[in-house]
A protein has these predicted regions:
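A secondary-structure capping/hinge motif
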Residues: 40-41
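The alpha-helix within a helix-turn-helix
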Residues: 11, 22, 51
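Short, charged recognition helix plus adjacent turn
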Residues: 60-98
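Short alpha-helical DNA-recognition segment
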Residues: 15-34
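Short, conserved catalytic or interaction motifs in soluble domains
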Residues: 37
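A short, Lys/Arg-rich alpha-helix, primarily the initiator
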Residues: 1-13, 97-98
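DNA major-groove recognition helix of helix-turn-helix/homeodomain DNA-binding modules
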Residues: 45-61
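Phosphate-coordinating loops and pocket residues in cytosolic domains that bind phosphorylated ligands
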Residues: 34, 52, 64-65
Length: 98
């Protein structure tokens, strides 16, 4: 999962609109949409702002390292997938008999 997808998954897991999410972390709506659509990537300053907020700290290790530490309160967002990989067939690996 890439950075834009991770941002979107975090926001949706928290049940927030783009405007609400942007307001909470103190960035503009247009900046957030540019991150979610992959036009820009958040820099270090924005990433620090995001994970300094208590509501989003639990996603830090997942977001940065694709890891989690439940004992430290780290979790993976509830929405593990946003859409299915278009290159993957739901029948991949099945025996079709042909």
């Amino acid at each position: 999962m890439d950075i834009p997808q991770k941002i979107r998954v975090m926001r949706k897991s928290e049940g927030l609109t783009q405007r609400e999410f942007a307001d909470i972390i103190g960035i503009s709506y247009s900046a957030l949409t540019s991150y979610e659509y992959g036009r820009n990537l958040p820099g270090l300053e924005i990433t620090i702002k995001l994970f300094k907020h208590p509501r989003f700290r639990k996603y830090r290790d997942w977001f940065l390292f694709d890891e989690m530490e439940p004992k430290a309160g780290q979790v993976i967002p509830a929405l593990a997938r946003v859409g299915q990989d278009e290159t993957e067939s739901p029948h991949y690996g099945s025996n079709s008999g042909e």
